[in-house]
Swiss-Prot record:
It comes from the Bacteria. The gene is fmt. (6S)-5,6,7,8-tetrahydrofolate binds at S110, L111, L112, P113. Belongs to the Fmt family. Attaches a formyl group to the free amino group of methionyl-tRNA(fMet). The formyl group appears to play a dual role in the initiator identity of N-formylmethionyl-tRNA by promoting its recognition by IF2 and preventing the misappropriation of this tRNA by the elongation apparatus. Coiled coil: none annotated. PANTHER family: METHIONYL-TRNA FORMYLTRANSFERASE, METHIONYL-TRNA FORMYLTRANSFERASE, MITOCHONDRIAL. This is Methionyl-tRNA formyltransferase. It catalyses: L-methionyl-tRNA(fMet) + (6R)-10-formyltetrahydrofolate = N-formyl-L-methionyl-tRNA(fMet) + (6S)-5,6,7,8-tetrahydrofolate + H(+). GO terms for molecular function: methionyl-tRNA formyltransferase activity. It holds the Pfam family Formyl_trans_N. Keywords: Protein biosynthesis, Transferase. InterPro entries: Fmt (IPR005794), Formyl_trans_C (IPR005793), Formyl_trans_C_sf (IPR037022), Formyl_transf_N (IPR002376), Formyl_transf_N_sf (IPR036477), Formyl_transferase-like_C_sf (IPR011034), GART_AS (IPR001555), Met-tRNA-FMT_C (IPR044135). Its EC number is 2.1.2.9.
Length: 316
């Protein structure tokens, strides 16, 4: 029986691990990131993959740095025939990449060579793409640059956010892996080199990308809001306080106004002027120190009115 070591960390990886187990492979170990403090109370929380592995009775390793020789040797001691990774979060050393007879493969949430890196789901929406997908490829020492083994496309609906698209891609990745692993083992898979000229990148989201720049067109800001939901969430500033924007709708500007100016306050949202004489309706927000709420509930308590401005020149 093929011995597999699985390496992954967040929710995206859980269905991928489950598929390997359900397909009858001998998953001899799971490698994931260490437990991390989470939430306001900083409670030490295990990664979702660790919880799933323990539930399934599979041994778990949690190296701080997998590239340290002692940690690498622990994984090699499991004698894997194949290593499968999905959103693991660390680069593997050559010693590990070279060991398994069937190689090391990665389940990546984009149509490579587009959107290499740690945040491909975010960038697919931020860039306004209408489709993305999952690629399974051999791992090499360069980030997401190995030969491709299989791909599947996934449509991006206009109402998708990172959360909904994440779930679609996770399921698609698990199904694609189920089809691909047998072909790797029997040698029928045909690797395809990536075109480096077409490579684009999706590095981890930075704090400055979360800030809404109201001078940009409404379409761009709509993609920003859904491309940062449920994490890390786009924000603006109102009266010197952070206001997170969880959800919005595209809408027409009823009159010309300065970008960031509240044009109208309606029952179902706050219409804000954006660049190029466009507008965005904020439908779900979160004031500093409070829970997220429907815009109509926020409006009731905040005394918002047309003509007020969101955002300041000094917001950084």
């Amino acid at each position: 029986m093929t011995r597999i070591v699985f390496m992954g960390t967040p929710d995206f990886s859980v269905p991928v691990l489950g598929t390997l187990i359900d397909d009858g492979y001998e998953v001899v170990g799971v490698v994931t990131q260490p437990d991390r403090p989470k939430g306001r109370k900083k409670v030490m929380t295990p990664p979702p993959v660790k919880e799933e592995a323990l539930r399934r009775g599979i041994p778990v390793l949690q190296p701080e740095k997998v590239r340290e020789e002692a940690e690498t040797d622990k994984i090699l001691a499991l004698e894997p025939d194949l290593i499968v990774t999905a959103a693991f979060g660390q680069i593997l050393p050559k010693k590990l990449l070279d060991y398994p007879k069937y190689g090391c493969i990665n389940v990546h949430a984009s149509l490579l060579p587009e959107l290499r890196g740690g945040a491909p789901i975010h960038y697919a929406i931020l860039e306004g793409k209408e489709k993305t997908g999952v690629t399974i490829m051999y791992m090499v020492e360069k980030l997401d640059a190995g030969d491709m083994l299989a791909k599947v496309e996934v449509d991006i609906e206009e109402t998708d956010n990172v959360g909904t698209l994440h779930d679609k891609l996770s399921k698609a990745g698990a199904a694609l892996l189920s089809e691909t692993v047998p072909r790797i083992i029997d040698g029928s898979v045909t690797p395809e080199k990536q075109d480096e000229q077409k490579a684009t990148y999706a590095p981890n989201i930075k704090r400055e990308q979360e800030l809404i720049d109201w001078s940009k067109p409404g379409e761009v800001l709509y993609n920003q809001v859904r491309g940062l939901n449920p994490w890390p969430v786009a924000y603006t500033v109102l009266n010197g306080q952070t206001l997170k924007v969880w959800a919005a709708k595209k809408c027409q500007a009823l009159k010309q106004a300065e970008p960031g100016e509240i044009v109208t306050v309606e029952k179902d949202g706050i219409v804000v002027a954006t660049g190029n004489d466009t507008a965005l309706k904020l439908t779900e927000v979160q004031p500093a120190g409070k829970k997220r709420m429907k815009a109509e509930d926020f409006v009731r308590g905040a005394g918002l009115q047309a003509g007020m401005k969101l955002g300041h020149d000094d917001e950084k």
